[in-house]
Curated annotation (Swiss-Prot):
One GO location term (cellular component): membrane
Coiled coil: none
Name of the protein in question: Uncharacterized transporter C11D3.06
Matches recorded under InterPro entries: MATE_euk, MATE_fam
Bilayer disposition of the protein: Multi-pass membrane protein
Keywords: Membrane, Transmembrane, Transmembrane helix, Transport
Family, as annotated: Belongs to the multi antimicrobial extrusion (MATE) (TC 2.A.66.1) family.
Organism: Schizosaccharomyces pombe (strain 972 / ATCC 24843) (Fission yeast)
One example of a Gene Ontology biological process annotation: xenobiotic detoxification by transmembrane export across the plasma membrane
GO molecular function, one term: transmembrane transporter activity
Record's subcellular location: Membrane
Membrane-traversing stretches: 4-24, 44-64, 87-107, 159-179, 184-204, 236-256, 280-300, 309-329, 343-363, 381-401, 405-425
């Protein structure tokens, strides 16, 4: 039992600061929306909608594209190729900056896209202006996330949280200064938040340089321009893997808006809650991915297999705790957000459905992490597309407009996450770990090194 307990301890201890970090990262936007909301309800709507659009597009480059580093970076670290990790970081900066360029165009010309999505011309116009001011800061978000992955790969999991504990309150102050004190209004919010992202990145570089993490950096190297292929491929597949789930939830939000004011308000409460809770399986998934990829790169397939199994058990346990808690507070939870009795009642009605998929969502997080650790982002993307877009979304939308309303939409989401969780669990448990270790080592090592490690 010693080895499994060691893995349980490792996952829990190292995922905790990662989860905290993502919660703080989300708070940068949340606090910006709250500060902007003091201008009025229309400004609140614009800020909330623009950040939602940013999350569904630009932030996918950061949170989906950097999954390539989870795989390749941890393989290198496991194989003891520390200096190669710094070169991979340089490759990541170049690749993700290039991938961010189309996002800049989408944000700059977002008005027709938003009108196509049936948003009002006024909201589309104001959101486009907001997003244009967010473009410079968005690259800071991408760079910060990539540098965090560079440190997490070296098992330095707390650095990002330390930095965000500093920049989160500064972000509130910056938003207040630019939005209200200097009178920039809606323009001030994206500028302030963008400054916070760049400040977070700069402070994290100083942490890596002067505190911990510099041993894997040996200066800029022209080799970072070589062999873009694996990083580009895994980045794009990671974006699709993460994006297909996020887009499905955004589609649910758009459909909920057509069901009326009360369902839309209840959906806003539920989505805000789910986004916060999702940081838990997402954080567990990152540590699982790093651990699995590390063992595969080190030629320890049995350890990688054990980590995946332990991660599945931890995911089920964590999901169960969240599920029980949500069911217990369902009748009073809506009061945190509103005094409207109809909204509170609808939140209480839908909460058991949201609670029902917490175990599946936790499995999705941990098993998705295991898949990324083996470099199989493509498999995760296919599973997500099949579950959400071929089954769950069509069913949920049909039920929503045939008497079930918001409950129908969330029935679809429960089915989707159940399919994803079960399929990914089966795929990971059926993995040929020796074969995956061979692939991991062969990405960066020669055949003699491969034979020596696996023997």
């Amino acid at each position: 039992m010693g080895r499994p307990l060691t893995e349980v301890k490792y996952l829990l201890i190292n995922s905790a600061p990662v989860i905290l970090g993502y919660a703080l990262q989300n708070s940068l936007q949340t606090s910006s929306v709250i500060v902007t909301g003091r201008l009025g309800p229309s400004e609140l709507s614009v800020a909330a909608f623009a950040y939602m659009f940013a999350m569904s597009t630009g932030w996918l480059i950061a949170l989906g594209g950097t999954t390539a580093f989870d795989t390749l970076g941890s393989n290198l670290w496991g194989a003891g190729k520390k200096q190669e990790l710094g070169i991979l970081l340089q490759t990541g900066f170049i690749v993700l900056s290039i991938l961010y360029l189309p996002i800049c165009l989408v944000w700059w010309y977002s008005k027709p896209i938003l009108i196509f999505l049936h948003q009002t011309p006024e909201l589309a116009e104001a959101s486009q202006k907001f997003l244009r001011y967010l473009i410079p800061g968005g690259l800071g978000y991408v760079c910060f996330e990539l540098l965090k992955k560079f440190l997490q790969t070296q098992e330095i999991t707390r650095a990002g949280s330390y930095i965000l504990l500093v920049t989160s309150p500064l972000n509130v102050a910056l938003n207040f200064l630019l939005v209200h004190y200097y009178g920039l209004g809606l323009k001030g919010a994206p500028l302030a938040t963008g400054l916070s992202y760049w400040l977070s990145f700069i402070l994290l570089t100083q942490y890596a340089k002067y505190v911990k993490g510099a041993e894997a950096w040996n200066g800029w190297n022209k080799r970072c321009l070589e062999n873009f292929g694996p990083f580009v491929k895994l980045s794009l597949l990671g974006i699709v893997m993460v994006g297909t789930e996020w887009w499905a939830f955004e589609i649910v939000a758009l459909v909920a808006g057509k069901l009326g004011a009360v369902p839309l308000a209840a959906q806003s409460v539920i989505m805000t809650t789910d986004q916060l809770l999702n940081t838990i399986p997402f954080g567990l998934g990152i540590i699982t991915s790093n651990r699995v990829a590390y063992y595969l790169g080190a030629g320890l397939p049995d350890n990688a297999s054990l980590t995946a199994k332990v991660a599945a058990i931890v995911g089920v346990a964590v999901g169960s705790v969240i599920m029980i808690t949500m069911i217990a507070v369902r009748n009073i939870y809506g009061r945190i957000f509103t005094n409207d009795p109809d909204v509170i009642q609808l939140v209480a009605l839908v909460m058991p459905l949201v609670a029902a998929f917490q175990i599946s969502d936790s499995l999705n997080g941990t098993m998705g992490g295991a898949l990324r650790g083996t470099g199989r982002q493509k498999v995760g993307a296919i599973v997500n597309i099949t579950a959400y877009y071929l089954f769950a979304l069509p069913l949920g939308i049909y039920l929503a407009f045939h008497g079930k309303g918001l409950v129908g939409l969330w029935i679809g989401q429960v089915i989707a996450l159940s399919i994803v969780g079960i399929l990914e669990l089966k795929i990971v448990m059926a993995t040929d770990w020796i074969s995956q270790s061979r692939k991991a080592i062969s990405r960066f090592g020669d055949s003699s090194e491969l034979t020596a490690l696996l023997n």
